[in-house]
UniProtKB/Swiss-Prot annotation:
Protein name: Anthranilate phosphoribosyltransferase
Family the UniProt entry places it in: Belongs to the anthranilate phosphoribosyltransferase family.
Gene: trpD
Known EC number: 2.4.2.18
Function of the molecule: Catalyzes the transfer of the phosphoribosyl group of 5-phosphorylribose-1-pyrophosphate (PRPP) to anthranilate to yield N-(5'-phosphoribosyl)-anthranilate (PRA).
Amino acid sequence: MSATSIQPLLDILFQGKALTREQTASLFSTLIQGEMNEAVMAGMLMALKIRGETIAEISGAADAMRAAAKPFPYPSSKRTEGIIDIVGTGGDGFNTINISTTAAFVAAAAGAKVAKHGNRSVSSKSGSSDLLAQFGIDLTMSPELASRCLESLNLCFLFAPHYHGGVKHAVPVRQALKTRTLFNVLGPLINPARPEFMLLGVYSPELVTPIARVLQALGTQRAMVVHGSGLDEVALHGSTQVAELKDGEIIEYQLTPADFGVPQAQISELEGGEPAQNAQITQSILQGQGSDAHTHAVAINAGCALYLCGLSDSVKAGTALALNTIKSGKAFELLNQLAKVSSETQE
């Protein structure tokens, strides 16, 4: 769309009115094609933020991003097995270990098909991609190879900038604004593998139910949107607020560590460090040699993923399966297999 054709949509926004899903998709399509002036982009993002984005607007922005993404070739088993993503928005302000990334290895080793969509760090010193790079896993592997990894190993990692090139047009504006915008919640919603199941952590409790409603609008089959006592994941140090999407309905409830069959820990016990240090922590957990707090934090998140996939009938049973999978060494073996496949492609 040209500058003149988007002006009526901007006028609606600047009057404090909401856009439809289709109108928002048109605006974001213009943005990611590099056809939006930076001043206009800043005005649009701030108008949305100040009024508060609607479910339709978040869904429309996600529609545009998904449509423009580099395609992901589905593996043949995709026809019968659903894919899950274990992902957080980041930006929760805590520098924890890489819980969701480590949980992805555990869930995959336990039988889930995990396509994890990740980026570099938002709130910690080490994001999903920072950690994987430490293990020699190629972040820019082709979509075809990623699909083969998902098929043969039950796991692949999709590096967001590799699939969503158009986001680069928003970087200068986002950096200049120095405040959260719609982009802070879009990342988890635009996985190019289009997972049927999602465990999605958000940085604010106010986002839990709205983001569940967005996933519902986007056609996600089953999901848990969680905020865990300050963290964008299931909490070991306190209660977790949940909005679960199941059979087209959203149910809201809270979970505590006792619901998973594990003891509560202090948030300080989950503090992470630089990528190299976090890689060592992840390796220890996957080898069955992690601290109780580290191991349990990973297991309760993997347990929720296994519950969502239908591999366990409760989050407690899922956690037990995750702990047994860690103990078996299968998750660490999977890490080595993925690193090996990745290194072979780089030679």
